[in-house]
Amino acid sequence: MPKISTESVNTTIAPSQPASTAPKDTATLFNPAKPTATPAQSSIDSVQPYHHKANHNQNRSIAQSGDATSSATASSSVTAAPKIGFVSLGCPKALVDSERIITELSRDGYQVASDYDGADLVVVNTCGFIESAVQESLDAIGEAISKNGKVIVTGCLGKEADKIREMHPAVLAVTGAHAYDEVIRAVALHVPKPDRSLDASYDPKIDLINEAGIKLTPSHYAYLKISEGCNHRCTFCIIPSLRGDLVSRPIDSVMNEALALKKAGVKELLIISQDTSAYGLDLKYKTSFWNGMPLKSKFYDLCQALNDLGIWVRLHYVYPYPHVDKVVELMGEKKLLPYLDIPFQHASHRILKAMKRPAHSENTLARIHAWREICPDIVIRSTFVVGFPGETEEDFQCLLDWLVEARLDRVGAFTYSEVEGAVANDLPNHVPEDVKQERYERLMTLQQDISAQKLQEKIGKTLMVLVDEIDREEGVAICRSYADAPEIDGHVYVDDIDAHVKVGQFLTVTIDDASEYDLFASYQA
């Protein structure tokens, strides 16, 4: 097996560059190697970066967006259709927004360009979550203007239209997040829709775009957004000001899309929102009919219905509320992937109170232990903020002690940074940057050891894995188990695969070895 290339391993704090979204037979993430040091040695002596990421960035360049949509639009009957370039930045929720806009544009007859030169106009879907994301978005707008000249801006940073226009006065239009219709109208204003009535061969009823729409992810997994906005007012976060309060989709709408995705060949659904466990609260858990059955727009009911589809269902952005216990019972019954992405953010009650985190008074350790009693195989991923204003060494040590007892499977961390408009900016006793970084390193070193220990326990066991990529030259499949969300968690590297193994296929493998974050397995056809 080839030597590991630590230079290309994604780190936790550096912005990540996404791999190509299309299924491929050439590995692009990094070349794996079975570890030559013990886990205890490697966490101390090696310089391998921390692999689990805090953010869920799903950035797509103009080339990646064009490549991902080419199969759906390449056979367009209007050969001279105008081409729209698309740059998508930010989280999976923003990626879903981009997918919807691209789908609607394609249905209107536009094609998606793969480069700036070939685009009649470029749409940039921005992120405004943290200052580094704001700067990245402003840079992307500038690049699009420089290389194309006709640019429409949408997404979370669109809330700051004055800032965008001050820096980039040449932009044609600015809209906010999930403003689909506004974007479509702005595109049509500056690049008129093709007149498909002039093409006698065009029949919208047999349009190549299926009910699931165009996806910017590989064909075997997709993000399913169940709600928009958030009712919480965490002091470090400005998402409610960018995306509004909680607005849930009716459950029949969610299930129709989920079924369409399954029919399109999707093997794994990643459920996303700002607060997945609050799903349906704004609808007062309204009952709808789907597939001839009454269903409540409620978190538990949705999980039950999704399970019945018979594909992998992975839950992201869940809060540790008591009603999540019932969903863990479904996992214990093997009816959902036993995986929870829960942003705990901290463990010190004093800091959680300053953050105004929901459920901060809950005994989260007791809840985690109870979940493991119900479902011993459950995997818990979380993110944490270190160096929040007012965080003392005692507060930080509380977090480290909590991690030792919690033994989470996947952890990412941010060092706190000010975000324009966040309440936390005005809190006293900001932590010096060097102290933030030192605490970040201590947290991630501790968690690296925990991760290594937990993965060592997998050696000798069998796991079902989903193939994401294949390196035919090395004979290695880059896969994920139920414990691994795409692009943010670890991988399972499977040796000596044969020509019959395909991307998007499930394999049952035996775990032979482990490193701090990844597993290494063998497969017998």
From Swiss-Prot:
Enzymatic class: transferase
Keyword list, A-Z: 4Fe-4S, Cytoplasm, Iron, Iron-sulfur, Metal-binding, S-adenosyl-L-methionine, Transferase
Biological process (GO), any one: tRNA modification
SMART domains, per the entry: Elp3 (SM00729)
Cofactors that this protein relies on: [4Fe-4S] cluster
Superkingdom, natural source: Bacteria
PROSITE patterns: MTTASE_N, MTTASE_RADICAL, RADICAL_SAM, TRAM
Sites where the protein binds [4Fe-4S] cluster 2: C230, C234, C237
Domain TRAM residues, every copy: 456-525
Region of interest (Disordered), residue spans: 1-44
GO CC list: cytosol
Domain Radical SAM core as annotated: residue spans: 216-453
Gene Ontology molecular functions: 4 iron, 4 sulfur cluster binding; aspartic acid methylthiotransferase activity; metal ion binding; protein methylthiotransferase activity
Free-text cofactor note: Binds 2 [4Fe-4S] clusters. One cluster is coordinated with 3 cysteines and an exchangeable S-adenosyl-L-methionine.
Protein EC: 2.8.4.4
InterPro entries xref list: Elp3/MiaA/NifB-like_rSAM, Methylthiotransferase, Methylthiotransferase_CS, Methylthiotransferase_N, Methylthiotransferase_N_sf, NA-bd_OB-fold, Ribosomal_uS12_MeSTrfase_RimO, rSAM
This protein's record includes keyword Metal-binding: yes
Polar residues bias: start-end ranges: 1-20
Domain MTTase N-terminal intervals: 82-192
Subcellular location(s) of the protein: Cytoplasm
PANTHER family in UniProt: RIBOSOMAL PROTEIN S12 METHYLTHIOTRANSFERASE RIMO, RIBOSOMAL PROTEIN US12 METHYLTHIOTRANSFERASE RIMO
Family stated for the protein in its record: Belongs to the methylthiotransferase family. RimO subfamily.
Name of the protein described by the UniProt record: Ribosomal protein uS12 methylthiotransferase RimO
Record organism: Psychrobacter arcticus (strain DSM 17307 / VKM B-2377 / 273-4)
Lineage of origin: Bacteria, Pseudomonadati, Pseudomonadota, Gammaproteobacteria, Moraxellales
